UniProtKB/Swiss-Prot annotation:
Organismal lineage: Bacteria, Pseudomonadati, Pseudomonadota, Gammaproteobacteria, Vibrionales
Molecular function GO labels: peptide binding; peptidyl-prolyl cis-trans isomerase activity; unfolded protein binding
Gene Ontology CC terms, in alphabetical order: outer membrane-bounded periplasmic space
Organism: Aliivibrio fischeri (strain ATCC 700601 / ES114) (Vibrio fischeri)
Reaction(s) this enzyme catalyzes, per UniProt: [protein]-peptidylproline (omega=180) = [protein]-peptidylproline (omega=0)
Name of the protein: Chaperone SurA
Domain of life: Bacteria
Compartments (UniProt record): Periplasm
Function: Chaperone involved in the correct folding and assembly of outer membrane proteins. Recognizes specific patterns of aromatic residues and the orientation of their side chains, which are found more frequently in integral outer membrane proteins. May act in both early periplasmic and late outer membrane-associated steps of protein maturation.
UniProt KW Signal keyword: yes
Ranges of residues in domain PpiC: 173-274, 283-383
Length: 437
């Protein structure tokens, strides 16, 4: 999880610990000792300059000089402690990752990297120093993330409860266009009559799921109030529906057939003709099969490709089946025992080369040999299907919300703890007096 972010450059520079030495001055001195580190007067002066520039650009008022200096000093002390935590944990940010972060900063602020360099220079901050400060900020953030995450415990019940609340809030604004068939239990009906009616409702539901026209079925069989409109109830929110309808609708999507379900007057079948305002998450799952040949000292890349091409020819000619070839040759024991089948999976679970194949291959077509980190493969897509993952997405959203809430709470507590446990000696405060903490 990224908990370090880069807003507008002016805001970013305000938040950063600017350990940048200004142009040489006659006297630079240690203002505070922080465990094994120090805060220099030049650090404070540079940070004060940055804060004032940012405030001026945004038209924000500032407190008096003494209060502002105290706030800046405290920020520098806490940042120094966090940097020391990162060093103790052995966190290092390499140049590749640093350059990626700098490019992200520029993009998020609609700048090129060159414009970002010009911006920092215009604020009196040498780009090289700014660059290293970003490196320190990322390292400190990683240390904070690692330490705080250990303190967070999210219970499954919390996720379920919040996910349910989010779903209810979403449902409150959702509109459904529904159609209805009612099979009425007549007065004086015997138990046999009721059972026959239930069987008829089940048969109708099955026919509808197989594609029968709902309006035709409603005209023919329904005894409900909208039978002469083909069962069409139009657009409604759940709160506007009869309770027996609303109780059955739990987030189903367009064209869903619901039922049959029983009420005091008989059996009911619903169809959701359309939905407005419902956030659904569908993913494509692929059932593929493959044959894997691993390279070794006795099996070269060329040899693996030749073997797989021979297997393809034998399968296409009808001499062999894919299943038999997978059992005989595949070096993926898990799938080989299942005729090479991998079962329904989302493509993202596979390595990039395999993912590309199962996403792009037409169903029933065997791929040419291709290489992954595991070896050489041929693959065939047997089936694709769309799977509703709305519930899972809602739970993931609930988990992220809980994580962010608890992270912010625990991060504040953690910062207070490391600040309290650090040795901090302010050598001269605003009154010129020494202060030990």
């Amino acid at each position: 999880m990224k908990n370090w972010k880069f807003p507008l450059i002016s805001t970013l520079l305000l938040l950063l610990t600017i350990n940048v030495h200004a142009a040489p001055v006659e006297l630079d001195r240690v203002v505070a000792i922080v465990d094994e580190g120090v805060v220099l007067q030049s650090d404070i002066d540079t940070s004060l300059k940055t804060v004032k520039i940012n405030a001026q650009e945004k038209g924000q008022p500032l407190p008096d000089e003494a209060v502002l200096r105290e706030q800046v000093l405290e920020k520098l002390i806490v940042d120094t402690i966090q940097s020391q935590q990162a060093e103790k944990m052995g966190i290092r940010i390499d140049d590749t990752r640093l350059e990626a972060a700098l490019n992200d900063i520029a993009k998020e602020n609609n700048m090129t990297l060159a414009q970002l360099q010009q911006k920092t220079a215009a604020q009196g901050l040498p780009y090289a120093n700014f660059r290293e400060q970003i490196r320190k900020e990322i390292a400190a953030s990683e240390a904070r993330n690692a330490q705080v995450r250990r303190r967070i415990n999210i219970l499954p019940q919390e996720v379920e409860s919040l996910a349910q609340l989010l779903a209810e809030e979403t449902q409150a604004t959702v509109q459904y266009k529904i159609s209805h068939i009612q099979l009425r239990v007549e007065d004086g009906a015997t138990q046999a009559d009721k059972e026959a009616l239930e069987k008829q409702a089940e048969d109708l539901t099955e026919r509808l799921k197989q594609g029968a026209d709902f309006a035709t079925m409603a005209y023919t069989y329904s005894k409900g109030p909208k039978a002469l409109q083909g069962g069409d109830w139009g657009w409604m929110r759940k709160e506007e529906m009869p309770t027996i309808f609303a109780d059955q609708i739990t987030g189903q999507g367009k064209n869903s057939i619901i039922g049959p379900f029983r009420s005091g007057v008989g059996f009911h079948i619903l169809k959701i003709d359309d939905v407005k305002g419902l956030e659904t998450v569908a993913v494509t799952e692929v059932n593929a099969r493959h044959i894997l040949i691993k390279t070794s000292v006795i099996m070269s890349d060329e040899g693996a490709q030749r073997l797989l091409n021979t297997i393809i020819d034998d399968i296409k000619s009808g001499k062999e089946t894919f299943a038999d070839m997978a059992q005989r040759y595949s070096q993926d024991p898990g799938s080989a025992a299942n005729d090479g089948e991998l079962g329904f999976q989302t493509p993202d679970l596979y390595v990039p080369e395999f993912k590309h194949q199962v996403e792009t291959l037409p169903v029933g077509q065997i791929s040419a040999p291709f290489k992954t980190v595991h070896g050489w493969h041929i693959a065939e897509v047997l089936e694709r299907r769309q799977v509703d993952r709305t519930d899972a997405a809602m739970k993931n959203k609930a988990y992220r919300i809980l994580l962010n809430r608890k992270f912010n709470e625990e991060a504040g507590a953690w910062l207070q703890e490391i600040r309290a446990s650090a040795y901090v000696e302010i050598l001269q405060d605003d009154d010129g007096e020494d202060d030990n903490e």
